[in-house]
């Protein structure tokens, strides 16, 4: 299939819009090697070097939920209930991947690739329980979480970070506890990327190092507990985790966490509800290649996978914003080490927050915004096309 080049663009409010031929329902956006991939029904748009291209795939209820780089860059979609992947030029994926790379029906997904190891929260069967899964590849064979470990609405962030000599996978999600009243609890969970699975034939494809710990984001008696989106940014000696939370208070908040502190908690905290002496190796410890956790360690982590700890943010929320925020991204300011401009979007409004001046500004656009991605300039992905540039914004005195 031949990609089509779109050259129609116009400026509005200092944003250069590269327009789609028709208004699109945006399904997914991914930034891979400074190329923006935007999935729609039956096609994927690519945007780089100020050029917008479209590759048609099929129009048979094929919602493109995934763009991912494994050996090649793949785009994957629902394909009318038969998930399938293609190369970016529209040709067939020679490995015929699809299940677990795209859902059976259009839904929000989380999928990442690290050194060609692929991990996702996408069901591999139509009626399957939501799980966090590692696919067969360079990091080992298929692994998945136990029943009901991952909430039905899935994961809201995933990344790999090094802890000592081991690579570890981190995922973020919000659990809902429904007892006398509904309580939402935000978590970050940790697993060893090269986990060898459980010690028996029944557990050999289960994560054997899964642990989780609660995140706190509170200000003035308001507790933010619904994770919307997250982003990890490496610094010289740490990785800073930015997490956007929603709440019932008509407000949202952005909190930051030190991954060094989170890793320390995973390695030193007690397990909630477990009172006996821990075996060796302790639950959650990464083992050398070829080593499998013993039964005693695995049995404990199956029953007690939550730390008796709560991770505090580095400070109070960086800022509070409106509820209903869909997405955010961060740009380090030129010549300002560790000073950032944070862009976030809601409906047809773009917001920016300056971490140095503590000022929030906003601008409205005549488009339905889906996401924002930051390269050398912010990219605003909307139903009408891709917007490039910093809009002319008005200062907000109070959110």
Curated annotation (Swiss-Prot):
Gene Ontology MF terms: chemorepellent activity; integrin binding; semaphorin receptor binding
Cross-referenced SUPFAM superfamilies: Sema domain
Keyword Transport: no
UniProt GO BP: integrin-mediated signaling pathway; positive regulation of cell migration; regulation of inflammatory response; semaphorin-plexin signaling pathway
Signal peptide residue numbers: 1-14
UniProt domain Sema: residue ranges: 15-399
Main location: secreted
One cellular component term from this protein's GO annotations in UniProt: extracellular region
Subcellular locations according to the entry: Secreted
Swiss-Prot/TrEMBL keywords: Secreted, Signal
A Pfam family recorded for this sequence: Sema
Record Gene3D superfamilies: YVTN repeat-like/Quinoprotein amine dehydrogenase
Family that this chain belongs to: Belongs to the semaphorin family.
Function of the protein: Acts as a semaphorin-like protein and binds to host plexin C1 receptor. May alter the movement of plexin C1-expressing cells including dendritic cells, monocytes, or granulocytes in the proximity of infected cells. May also regulate host cell cytoskeleton of neighboring cells to improve viral infection.
Subunit structure: Interacts with host VESPR.
Name of this protein: Semaphorin-like protein 139
Species classification: Viruses, Varidnaviria, Bamfordvirae, Nucleocytoviricota, Pokkesviricetes
């Amino acid at each position: 299939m031949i990609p089509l080049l779109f050259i129609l663009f116009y400026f509005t409010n200092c944003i250069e819009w590269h327009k789609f031929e028709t208004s699109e329902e945006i399904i997914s956006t991914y930034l891979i090697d400074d190329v923006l991939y935007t999935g729609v029904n039956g096609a994927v748009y690519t945007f780089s070097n100020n050029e917008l291209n479209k590759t048609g795939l099929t129009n048979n209820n094929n919602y493109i939920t995934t763009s991912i780089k494994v050996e090649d860059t793949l785009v994957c979609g629902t394909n009318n209930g038969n998930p399938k992947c293609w190369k970016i030029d529209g040709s067939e994926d020679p490995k015929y991947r699809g299940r677990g790379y795209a859902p059976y029906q259009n839904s929000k997904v989380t999928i990442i690739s690290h050194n060609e190891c692929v991990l996702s929260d996408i069901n591999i069967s139509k009626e399957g329980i939501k799980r966090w899964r590692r696919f067969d590849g360079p990091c080992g064979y298929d692994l998945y979480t136990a029943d009901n470990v991952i909430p039905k609405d899935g994961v809201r962030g995933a990344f790999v970070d090094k802890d000592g000599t081991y690579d570890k996978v981190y995922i973020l999600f919000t659990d809902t506890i429904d007892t006398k009243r509904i309580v939402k609890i935000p978590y970050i969970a940790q697993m060893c990327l090269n986990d060898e699975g459980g010690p028996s034939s029944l557990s050999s494809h289960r994560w054997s190092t899964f642990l989780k710990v609660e995140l706190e984001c509170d200000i003035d008696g308001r507790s933010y507990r619904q994770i919307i989106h997250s982003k990890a940014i490496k610094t010289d000696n740490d990785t800073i985790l930015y997490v956007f939370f929603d709440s019932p208070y008509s407000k949202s908040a952005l909190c930051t966490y030190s991954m060094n502190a989170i890793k320390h908690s995973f390695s030193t905290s007690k397990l909630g509800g477990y009172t006996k002496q821990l075996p060796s190796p302790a639950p959650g410890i990464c083992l050398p290649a070829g080593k499998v956790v013993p039964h005693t360690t695995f049995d404990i982590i199956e029953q007690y996978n939550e730390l008796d700890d709560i991770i505090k943010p580095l400070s109070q929320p960086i800022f509070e914003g409106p509820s209903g925020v869909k997405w955010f991204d961060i740009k380090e300011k030129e010549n300002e080490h560790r000073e950032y401009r944070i862009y976030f979007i809601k409906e047809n409004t773009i917001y920016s927050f300056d971490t140095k001046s503590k000022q929030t500004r906003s601008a409205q656009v005549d488009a339905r915004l889906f996401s924002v991605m930051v390269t050398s300039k912010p990219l605003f992905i909307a139903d009408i096309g891709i917007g490039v540039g910093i809009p002319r914004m008005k200062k907000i005195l109070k959110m």
